[in-house]
Amino acid sequence: MTKIVIWAQSVCRSTMDLYREVKRLRDDVGVTVVLRRDGRGEDVRKLREAQGQGDYSDVVDRVWDGKFESGVELLDLGAVHVFSGYQVNHAVRELMVEAKRRALRVVEYDEAPCEMCVGVKGVLKRLYYAMILPMMVRRAVEAADLFISASGNMGMDRLVRLGWKREAIVPFGYTSGGFGEWGTGNGELEMGRGLRVLHTGVEAKYRGVDVLKRAAASLKRRGVELEVKFTGGKVDAAQLPRLYEWADVVVACGLCEPWGMRVNDVLLEGIPVVVSDGMGAAMLCDEFGCGCVVPKGDANALAAVLERCANDRGFLAHLRSGAKMAAAEIAPEKRAKVWLGKVLGE
């Protein structure tokens, strides 16, 4: 039996739903999930549980305090180790090096560097990514056999600048079980009403909400009928399926986001999306034809896509069909098979 150890950085549905399915997948593969519970990890756990994401106690097998000395003892649990958090955790980086010294297979499942800050903080963060982080992670990167990118196709050049070989980078993204019944979608666009456009989550600058507002204002000035709903912040998980059912299309126009879990949630409901190329989740639109990708920050391009959705019902029906197909393909059960195959080098 091949034994795999997954070093989980925090309790989050974006990874825990995947790990649960990986553990169930094959009789010839044994999986141990180790959860980091140092100070930061515990804070993240409490936040996730407050958001209704659960404690995933059925997924986690071991708890790790985030220290190198105690982590070394866990290296004996498997021949394949999937780490995460190498950018921010020194102990993880040292464990990657030690695992390679022991001739174990080392995989890093993580995001590409992505700068969501603005102003002076953003400038400093970019300098950190360019000048300091590459030196910090060099030995860990050299120790790894594979990098599975939770950012999909986004940020490949940034990963290469950190020292990753392009051929060792596998685009993947995140996955989740969603919140409602999969693939239900909205019905046909009703006569006598405009296009219903939904934007969920916080209205932070990095999410590009101003881009959608400018696009909507432009369309209304030109007489295009549409209704745009902004949730204006985080929404209780129980309310999300009803919101998705209301929408004809959901817009996620982030300027710089490593992935964007709301895109997964929307597609699992069978609702098409319009995603900016500043988000890793744009990969799903390219792969499944379940929506449109627009240049980040481009209100005119976003307006053009929404206008076509409003006026061309055949086009919108095509996107809906793609969304319903994607609902089955991006579910954790399906994605777990792909992920595990990459981890094992199959």
Predicted regions, residues:
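Short alpha-helical segment that forms part of, or immediately flanks, the ligand-binding pocket
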Residues: 241, 264-268, 282-283
